[in-house]
């Protein structure tokens, strides 16, 4: 772990920004885990990444996996000894687990809710309480804060782990009120379809274009079911990019290199499924933000101009605004705040730093490879730590936190690589993971 702390749900927001969005796909690293920014870039450029290639270090997972119980007390089982003495009924408390939150933490969380009555009106609080296992009545009380904290510590422990602070903010809410692509089972179902209709049919599909079209067709089925306009498939100019969403033209870009070759390994297929699903979650996010702005009365032209999306997509959002005061509207508001609202300047700084840190790390790595002196090793260590901190901050952006938590479910549906080509001799080695797993496309990061 890098030691870089994730900001609280109530963390500081910067002043009004210029909008940015997109994603630079990162390489798979140790033990086959993908890591690196799936960022969103400026509306001036594609949401996808392209640029320099570099081996990635193992990236730390940031987050707080807190204890899962406030207090445990068990009664010693009663036993009758052979001597016939009365059973021992002494109550022996076990050592108390570390509390999820102390009194000050509970007070901060209660203040977080009560200071934002427009975000947490009674209707939202009622649904939130029910979602975390409480009686709907009660409003903001200690029980709500502790129940949210407990939910964060258990249900929110998957990477990227949620901070356990009792605040159901823009990172926690999308997981509590799952919808669309992060609904339980949806990602695994998509991954299973990728396995049967793309990976198992690798030789039949034959070309990168055919494989890309089938991939995007499959993920579009999920988007359509969620009420999100489908994307168009296109080749990414960066051939090794395994997926990126360009919201300015509503296109999913996948590089030919990521889908080329006569075979694909399970690792490489899982990376593609994960990345495409992650990017499709960004598609869903951007349409929800458009629907949120529609619910506030913006015209289709206004939505298109503000978000930088096609007018045709904005018209669809305008025709289907989110219900005001609903959990989904509150979730979309959190994403909008991060990308276009009060958090946008902070987001710009985070994306700029992860790009700069990656380039500095690459330069330090090259210097060390050419001259592995103690000084160059120290410089490489420092540059790597800087990149890990920057990546933690990037992954903590609300929209990225959500997408990074959503994508891995698709990878779980991949169970094998493609069948060997029919003309492959017996005992042929499996295909390599491809250059996408060693590449860090960064060019489109702002």
Where are the language model's segments positioned?
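Juxtamembrane/interface and other helix-to-disorder boundary residues
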Residues: 1-130, 142, 146-153, 158-160, ...
